[in-house]
Design a protein with these regions (language model features):
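Post-transcriptional modification and biogenesis factors for structured RNAs
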Residues: 1-182
């Protein structure tokens, strides 16, 4: 899909509507765990839409669409949002549907994203945690934890940035997988 010219006569909504007819969906979702900054959820939604994710799952509170719409570049209208009250409810949803759970977390069991191979035999959800406390232990113990390697001075990335990087890697591996299997 080629980007459009910088000077447009159509509204953003018209451009998105047109692009939606050509867009593809890949078998991945993002789960945001009780984000402390609502803007991070909006940016995560935008990345999920751009990469073709099936849905954004939210554990905890969800700000009103009127808040998310302008901050997500209006992309909230183009993705399915699922909301869960607790990590247990989320895990039950994934178990019932046989969804792979991959969590972005800095923990001893985590695998370097560069060494991780996504399983495309079933759908995947990528969990990114709260900005201050991370992914709940209940989810970590029922998922494959991964981490993003970096050599700079920072210790961790913003949760919306993390989800975008992992979505990009999922998208890359999925494209290679489809070339090999088709």
């Amino acid at each position: 899909l080629k980007p459009t010219a910088p000077y447009r006569s159509e509204t953003r909504r018209q451009r998105y509507d047109k692009r939606a007819t050509l867009a593809k969906t890949i078998p991945v979702s993002i789960c945001a765990v009780n984000f402390g900054l609502d803007e991070n959820l909006a940016m995560t939604i935008r990345s999920a839409v751009c990469y073709g994710a099936e849905s954004v799952m939210i554990i905890g509170s969800k700000p009103p669409d009127s808040f998310l719409r302008p901050r997500s570049g209006t992309t909230i209208s183009y993705i399915n949002i699922l909301q869960f009250s607790t990590p247990h409810d989320f895990l039950e949803h994934c178990r019932d549907r046989d969804i792979n759970i991959v969590s972005a977390e800095l923990c001893d069991e985590a695998v370097d994203l560069n060494d991780f191979e996504f399983d495309f035999d079933k759908k995947t959800v990528i969990v990114t945690g709260n900005e201050w406390v991370g992914v709940p232990a209940e989810i970590i113990h029922n998922s494959q934890p991964i981490y993003l390697p970096y050599c700079g001075k920072g210790y961790s990335l913003n949760t919306a940035v993390t989800s975008s990087i992992i979505l990009s890697e999922f998208n890359r591996q999925y494209a290679i997988h489809n070339r090999i299997t088709t």
